Every structure is written in C-alpha cells, then in structure tokens.
C-alpha cells in the first residue's frame, strides 16, 4: 500500500546465489519444442513507477568499496551489427530498464562487463561474424550476445542504486555462494 503512494519505490532485493550453467556442449532442443521457463538468474530487482519516467533511468551496481561494477539504462545500447553463425532467435535481447508506469522486474546476471573480443574462428583466423557453440540446454532468447562473458562477482554485499527523475534510491543486497558448493 505504501508503494502506491510513492512516485517511485525500489523494493529490497532478496539474496542472489552464484549459480553457473554447466558447460556441456551438445545439440540444443529445437526452438519449437515446448519447455518450461527457468526462473530469473542472478540478482532480481523490482521497482514501481507511479507515472511513466520523463527521462532515462539507470540502475548502478556497486561493490563494497563503492566502485561501479555495472550500469544498466532505459536507453538501449547500439546494436551489434556483426552477424552470428546461429539464428538470431537464440540470442538474448539487450537488457533495458522499463520506464512505463507500473511494476517492473530486472535481473542482473552477477557478472562484470563482458571483455572486448576479436572474432577468431576455431582455426585461429579472423572472421567477419560471431561464432557460437550452443549448449544442449540453450534456450531461444537466452544465449549471451557476447561470445565471452565477464566473470561473476564474488560473494559479498553489494549496492544497487536506481536513478529516476533526478532522485536516487539505493538498496543493499547480498550475493551468496552456490549452496551446492562447500
């Protein structure tokens, strides 16, 4: 009820677990095969906007020393024009914050930014496309666009700061080790 009265409400996130996908390289299921949706992975942030945002909004993730790890925006990044060697329906859409009125959910995969890469083939020569090997558990729309992803953050306490209309809303959250690892 309190969120209904505030122009912006940034909900306290639950702890996020560092869980990695396996590395099995095999043929994925065809995209037309019905499969269940996986839960969002990483840190999940919920925010409420009583009115549409009048400008861009940002979500900044900071480490315990207040250094910025990642920043996300409501402005889409420029598209990567390098063609992939797989159908584009496998690739994940860019992560963009929503600015419409209402409740929104955003997931951060607990990773640092992707490193810059050069497009090399398996044989070591430069190529003019992005080369992917899809895992057997690949799902349409959930394959990273970058062929090399950034490393995961270590377990610890982090701060997420949502900036909307010139105001900032900060929430601390914890990243915990995979509970299956001891």
What does each model-identified segment do?
Residues 1-182:
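C-terminal low-complexity, glycine/proline- and small-hydrophobic-enriched intrinsically disordered tails
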């Amino acid at each position: 009820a309190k969120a209904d009265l505030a122009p912006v409400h940034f909900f306290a996130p639950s702890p996020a677990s560092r869980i990695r996908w396996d590395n099995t390289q095999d043929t994925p299921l065809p995209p037309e095969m019905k499969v269940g949706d996986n839960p969002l992975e990483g840190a999940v942030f919920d925010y409420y906007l009583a009115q549409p945002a009048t400008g861009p909004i940002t979500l900044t993730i900071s480490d315990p020393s207040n250094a910025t790890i990642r920043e996300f925006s409501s402005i889409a990044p420029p598209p990567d024009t390098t063609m992939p060697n797989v159908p584009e329906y496998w690739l994940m859409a860019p992560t963009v914050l929503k600015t419409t009125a209402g409740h929104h959910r955003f997931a951060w995969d607990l990773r640092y930014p992707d490193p810059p890469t050069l497009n090399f083939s398996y044989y070591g020569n430069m190529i003019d496309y992005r080369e992917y090997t899809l895992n057997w558990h690949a799902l349409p729309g959930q394959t990273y666009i970058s062929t090399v992803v950034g490393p995961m953050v270590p377990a610890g306490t982090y701060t997420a700061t949502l900036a909307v209309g010139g105001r900032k809303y900060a929430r601390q959250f914890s990243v915990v080790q995979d509970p299956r690892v001891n």
